[in-house]
A protein has these predicted regions:
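Residues within well-ordered beta-strands of beta-sheet-rich folds
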Residues: 12-14, 137-139, 150-152
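Short coil-to-beta-strand transition motifs
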Residues: 5-10, 143-148
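Short, exposed beta-strand-loop hairpins at the edges of beta-sheets
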Residues: 14-21, 152-161
């Protein structure tokens, strides 16, 4: 299967040179019909390179969700790995930056104040053990965009590959009052998500 597409092939191998003897191989590749992928489905396989676009859920031009070979989700356009940014190792930092999360479907929430960091919403690192089968609400900070994130898998334990899969479905979330601004705990004050940019040269934020 070609990730991010509906293209599948049957690959019948004819030869494979082993024992470091040259790396030769041969096969016949035949187009095939594979399973339909639900709209909004995304999967990063274990040990897949998180820096590659096909292993990032590019929600928008500047929101790219992925995960390294361990730890939690992060935002690949602004973060090179999960960012604690001073947060406790078990309760976590603001990653993935630019997003905030709440437990359960978006329709369950009537106030933006119920949203938290990803690890804050799932109950810390230990909470990720039970992500498969659970639905969380994700809000894109600074917008009225909400999504229901239904997790199908989430590889646990350190150095086991960092794989995960979910279906992301647009949802209607709580209205945000005009002029409302909030910086999450441990949000990086150098990022625009955590600055109230009142004018081109007046940006209000706060350090940790």
């Amino acid at each position: 299967h070609i990730i991010g597409t509906d293209i599948y092939f049957d690959v019948e191998f004819h030869s494979w040179t082993s024992n470091n003897s040259g790396g030769g191989f041969s096969y016949t590749r035949t187009p095939a019909d594979g399973p339909d992928l639900p709209d909004g489905y995304f999967r990063k396989p274990d040990f897949a390179d998180a820096s590659l676009p096909e292993n990032q859920d590019r929600v928008s031009d500047d929101i790219w969700i992925t995960r390294g070979n361990n730890q939690a989700l992060y935002h690949a356009a602004f973060e090179g790995s999960y960012n604690y940014n001073g947060g406790h190792s078990h309760t976590g930092g603001p990653s993935p930056s630019g997003t905030e999360w709440a437990s359960g479907p978006t329709e369950n929430h009537s106030s933006i104040e119920s949203y938290n960091t990803f690890l804050g919403a799932v109950g810390g690192e230990w909470g990720t053990e039970n992500l498969a089968g659970q639905t969380y609400s994700m809000h894109i900070i600074g917008t009225d965009q909400y999504y229901d994130i239904q997790f199908h898998s989430y590889t646990m334990d350190q150095q086991n590959g960092g794989g995960f899969a979910y279906i992301r479905t647009p949802a209607t979330g709580p209205e945000i009052p005009d002029g409302y601004f909030r910086k999450l705990n441990y949000g990086d004050p150098n990022l625009s998500f955590y600055q109230d940019r009142i004018t081109d040269d007046v940006w209000i934020t706060r350090s940790n």
